[in-house]
């Protein structure tokens, strides 16, 4: 029978000092011997996805103590990628993921906590906490802050849906008036919550459902809706149940590594492909798998991308649907249900509810259940009220969207494409692979050949795009922006958005060893591995080189002879594979991150051979 980890600091005369300190935190005599459950919050006023989380930790804590646990809350940092975007702040975004994972480990192990409830929401916070949960392997429940309502405004007598990316694109479009640009800016992000499309934050929160580590609805129920409160309350109750099963019944099936198995990672990646999720999820799943000691690699992603269809298109891949529409269509359980019926899901993987994912689908998929409470839950909709307050409204759609032919979520028979929403490409310029979100690529450019125009940094690329250097037919190459070369692997949302602003969204490709925001669409290929700073061939591309991209056949090639490539490699070996004439201040903390960082195909985790 496993002993409570917290007994290390609460039992025996030698721990009198520790107990005295625990008492000073509010613990009573009868609390010693109960599981101490860490409530890992991420409240901050810097991030709209986290601005409403201040009271969520204590909401969960009260429920934990109601059912027999002792709750102790602490906070992690949280970076807003949208606010950090387009300047030096973005260098810190991806490194913050690993810092979050480490900080959770430090707090939980230093204080010998028995279990965790992870309250996350935005881009690097959910992955960081996920890495920590799989590293620590103690009972854990994830509950997120929930998606933002879609922005809405009236243009040309039509109501249109908006998000952050629309504000960025229109703000840089010289043909859009100041008044219209400001109108869009003011309307794009109306409430608290993670940005309203299938960007990185929402993608990752959806994936925790597929991994089995969060409750149904976690990825899709709006931050503003009263129903989300029930998810927080249920998380508090469920973590106590998991503690009892593990510490009192020796049931190891409730542990994160028992739930997030290789098959569960396959399910999560299949979900991401089916819903056209962010390419960042690839990076984070690879990193999480390493923490779980699961052999999940780019080869698995390639395998799945060839068989899983694209069942849902959500902003930024279309402006018709946002996360509020995914929820109305049955949420993640509905997409997993369609994958299951298509024979593309491992239905025997386990969840924190003690069910198999197949049993959970049977209970929560609106196509399978007639339970009125389940249908009511998935009718939860937006109120259209500007607010930073959680649980403010109880608006509901009249009906759920169960149209699997033309609705937000499709069946395999009526899929947007049979080829999935993400693809891994490989070739001489990306020997270890690169990633493209095919759900966001126009069919006319699935095959593309163009001349390279090379930039040594994101900043130079932005200047080149807005300055008219980039023309139709170009392949924009942005290099030395990988985990090591940045350092920090910046997101390239501004370059991709500005290509659209300049009318080049369907006329150019973009290739980088950096990464993309979940808000990116278009022929945007990232995670090029090995990265330039690690000796990847993207580091030897020259202006005018022809790059051929063939998404249907999963190929990307630099059309330069082997002899010429050998000469260029030798030249870069002498130069140390560093960007030419880049002016960038890099702090000591970022230099340390860059020194240990691996390329994107390894999840940009630390290189353990250097330790």
UniProtKB/Swiss-Prot annotation:
**Amino-acid positions noted as binding [2Fe-2S] cluster in the UniProt annotation, renumbered to this chain:** 122, 195
What SUPFAM superfamilies is this protein classified in? IlvD/EDD N-terminal domain-like, LeuD/IlvD-like
Tell me its EC number(s), please: 4.2.1.9
Q: Where does Mg(2+) bind?
A: 81, 123-124, 491
Source taxon at top rank: Bacteria
- UniProt enzyme class: lyase
Its GO biological process terms? isoleucine biosynthetic process; L-valine biosynthetic process
Which UniProt keywords are given for this protein, alphabetically ordered?
Answer: 2Fe-2S, Amino-acid biosynthesis, Branched-chain amino acid biosynthesis, Iron, Iron-sulfur, Lyase, Magnesium, Metal-binding
Which molecular-function annotation in GO is an example for this chain?
2 iron, 2 sulfur cluster binding
Q: Where is the active site?
A: 517
Q: Which Gene3D superfamilies match?
A: IlvD/EDD C-terminal domain-like
Keyword presence, Acetylation: no
Q: Which residues carry this modification: N6-carboxylysine?
A: 124
Q: Which cofactor does it need?
A: [2Fe-2S] cluster; Mg(2+)
Co-factor remark: Binds 1 [2Fe-2S] cluster per subunit. This cluster acts as a Lewis acid cofactor.
Signal peptide span per the entry? none
Pathway(s) where this gene product acts: Amino-acid biosynthesis; L-isoleucine biosynthesis; L-isoleucine from 2-oxobutanoate: step 3/4; Amino-acid biosynthesis; L-valine biosynthesis; L-valine from pyruvate: step 3/4
Name the catalysed reactions.
(2R)-2,3-dihydroxy-3-methylbutanoate = 3-methyl-2-oxobutanoate + H2O; (2R,3R)-2,3-dihydroxy-3-methylpentanoate = (S)-3-methyl-2-oxopentanoate + H2O
Q: Give the quaternary structure.
A: Homodimer.
Q: Which family does it belong to?
A: Belongs to the IlvD/Edd family.
Q: What is this protein called?
A: Dihydroxy-acid dehydratase
Species of origin: Histophilus somni (strain 129Pt)
């Amino acid at each position: 029978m496993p002993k409570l980890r917290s007994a290390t600091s609460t039992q025996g005369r030698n721990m009198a000092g520790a107990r005295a300190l625990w008492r000073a935190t509010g613990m009573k005599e009868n609390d010693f011997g109960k599981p101490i459950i860490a409530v890992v919050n991420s409240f901050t006023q810097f991030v709209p996805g986290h601005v409403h989380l201040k009271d969520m930790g204590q909401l969960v804590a009260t429920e934990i103590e109601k059912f027999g646990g002792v709750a102790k809350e602490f906070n992690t940092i949280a970076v807003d990628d949208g606010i950090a975007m387009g300047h030096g702040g973005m260098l810190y975004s991806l490194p913050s993921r690993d810092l979050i994972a480490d900080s959770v480990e430090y707090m939980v192990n230093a204080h010998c906590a028995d279990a965790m409830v992870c309250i996350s929401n935005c881009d690097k916070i959910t992955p960081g906490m996920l890495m920590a949960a799989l590293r620590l392997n103690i009972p854990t429940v994830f509950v997120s802050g929930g998606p933002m309502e879609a922005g809405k405004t009236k243009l040309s007598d039509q109501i249109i849906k908006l998000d952050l990316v629309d504000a960025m694109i229109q703000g840089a479009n010289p043909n859009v008036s100041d008044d219209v640009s400001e109108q869009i800016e003011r309307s794009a992000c109306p409430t608290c919550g993670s940005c309203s499309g299938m960007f990185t934050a929402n993608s990752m929160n959806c994936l925790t459902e597929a991994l089995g580590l969060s409750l149904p609805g976690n990825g899709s129920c709006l931050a503003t809706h009263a129903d989300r409160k029930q998810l927080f309350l249920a998380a508090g109750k469920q973590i106590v149940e998991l503690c009892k099963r593990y510490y009192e019944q020796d049931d190891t099936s409730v542990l994160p590594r028992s739930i997030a198995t290789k098959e569960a990672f396959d399910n999560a990646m299949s979900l991401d492909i089916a819903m056209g999720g962010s390419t960042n999820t690839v990076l984070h799943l690879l990193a999480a798998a390493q923490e779980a000691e699961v052999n999940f690699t780019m080869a698995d992603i390639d395998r799945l991308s060839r068989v899983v269809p694209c069942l849902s298109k959500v902003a930024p891949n279309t402006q018709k649907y946002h996360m509020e529409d995914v929820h109305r269509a049955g949420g993640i359980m509905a997409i997993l249900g369609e994958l299951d019926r298509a024979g593309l899901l491992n239905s025997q993987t386990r969840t924190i509810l003690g069910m198999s994912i197949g049993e959970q689908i049977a209970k929560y998929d609106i196509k399978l259940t007639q339970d009125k409470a389940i249908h009511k839950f998935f009718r939860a909709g937006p109120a259209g009220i500007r607010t930073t307050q959680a649980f403010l409204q109880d608006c509901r759609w009249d009906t759920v969207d169960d149209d699997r032919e033309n609705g937000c979520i499709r069946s395999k028979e009526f899929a947007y494409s049979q080829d999935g929403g993400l693809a891994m490409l490989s070739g001489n310029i990306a020997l270890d692979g690169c990633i493209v979100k095919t759900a966001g690529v126009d069919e006319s450019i699935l095959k593309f050949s163009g001349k390279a125009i090379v930039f040594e940094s994101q900043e130079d690329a932005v200047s080149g795009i807005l300055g008219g250097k980039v023309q139709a037919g170009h392949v924009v190459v942005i290099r030395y922006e990988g985990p090591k070369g940045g350092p920090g692997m910046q997101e390239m949302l501004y370059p991709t958005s500005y290509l659209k602003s300049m009318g080049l969204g369907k006329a150019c490709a973009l290739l980088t060893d950096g990464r993309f925001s979940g808000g990116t669409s278009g022929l945007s290929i990232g995670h090029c591995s090995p990265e330039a700073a690690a000796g990847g061939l993207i580091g030897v591309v020259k202006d005018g080189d022809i790059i051929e991209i063939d998404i249907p056949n999963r190929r990307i090639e630099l059309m330069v002879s082997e002899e010429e490539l050998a000469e260029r490699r030798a030249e870069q070996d002498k130069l140390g594979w560093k960007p030419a004439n880049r002016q960038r201040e890099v702090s000591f903390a970022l230099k340390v991150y860059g020194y240990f960082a691996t390329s994107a195909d390894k999840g940009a985790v630390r290189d353990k051979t250097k330790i």
